[in-house]
Design a protein with these regions (language model features):
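Alpha-helical transmembrane segments of integral membrane proteins
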Residues: 127-300
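Gly/Trp-centered helix-boundary motif
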Residues: 5-157, 161, 165-166
């Protein structure tokens, strides 16, 4: 009957929905959190409350816990003093900082008000050992770390795809030479290669992108070679050869589009790996130079 048919259709749809929900699990929530983090880091100039390298008061403002709010005293000579408490006096200001009281004359302060000072500083996630705001450094550092990871991935994947395709399409001799080179490079520990290149080249994010990109292409080359070797004898490729198309055109028009799925999967995985490598190098003092913020030198 029609009612029974509709029931079976609805049952099939609901069971299919349950299967999708079980397969996905918490993936949508994880993707949402990741997208939120990426968006926050990209919007760092608008979301960060302070300059990530500003050190307002390395004595009273260092290592403050999350949620700490302090009075910010603007000095006439330039710079700031951070205080836990501020009391206005007839001649100026009395502030409590670093566990003791201190008196400032009125001409030494530029942001006096009848009740104290006009400015405050709120450390939402606390401060580091140089009184820098951790939230601002996390946002700016995430933007830099993700940029380094993405650009290094582009270099790494471009080099790996090019060498892997050349090995697969260039004949037996070229394939043997390139694959032995890849295997030789893969026997060297990754961080030894990074450290050696880092010692030879100048400091800076651009150099770090180049180092990470040049040292992470070997696996992509092997994956590309494997995919191209499996595709180049397919019927559609043989038909293209029968039409006297060049090997370059066959690769770009017929082989590469069919090999993209595993290459894109690996490219997405390698971004996280390269971000972790940047963080590890910065933690060891070989990555992004201080005071520039990155996730790695924040850990340091």
């Amino acid at each position: 009957s029609e009612g029974a048919g509709e029931t079976r259709v609805m049952s099939g749809l609901s069971s299919r929905g349950r299967r999708w929900r079980r397969a996905l699990g918490r993936a949508p929530w994880s993707a949402g959190v990741l997208a939120l983090m990426v968006a926050a880091c990209l919007a760092a100039p608008w979301l960060a409350p302070y300059d990530p390298i500003e050190q307002p008061d390395t004595v009273a403002g260092k290592l403050r816990p999350p949620g700490t709010e302090m009075h910010a005293v603007a000095l006439a000579r330039g710079g700031w003093m951070l205080a836990d408490r501020v009391e206005r006096t007839p001649g100026g200001l009395r502030i409590h900082r670093a566990g003791r009281w201190q008196t400032l004359e009125a001409e030494q302060v530029t942001n006096l008000t009848p009740s104290g000072v006009a400015d405050r500083r709120l450390y939402r996630l606390g401060s580091d050992g140089f009184s820098r705001d951790i939230l601002s450094r996390w946002l700016y550092g995430g933007r830099l770390s993700m940029t380094i990871g993405l650009l290094a991935m582009v270099i790494s994947c471009g080099l790996g795809v090019g060498i892997g395709a050349l090995a697969a399409m260039g004949g037996r001799v070229l394939d043997t030479v390139l694959m032995r080179l890849v295997e030789a490079l893969q026997t060297v520990p990754f961080f030894m290669v990074l450290s050696a290149l880092r010692a030879l080249l100048p400091t800076g994010p651009g150099t770090l992108i180049l180092i990470l990109g040049l040292s992470g292409w070997t696996t992509m080359a092997r994956i590309t070679r494997s995919e191209v070797l499996s595709l180049r004898e397919r019927d559609f490729v043989l038909a293209a050869r029968g039409l006297c198309l060049s090997e370059t055109r066959i690769f770009l028009r017929h082989v590469l589009p069919n090999a993209l799925t595993p290459l894109l999967v690996y490219a997405t995985l390698v971004v996280g790996y390269l971000i972790s490598a940047e963080a590890a190098l910065s933690f060891l003092g070989l990555g992004v130079p201080v005071p520039q913020a990155s996730w790695g030198n924040m850990i340091e």
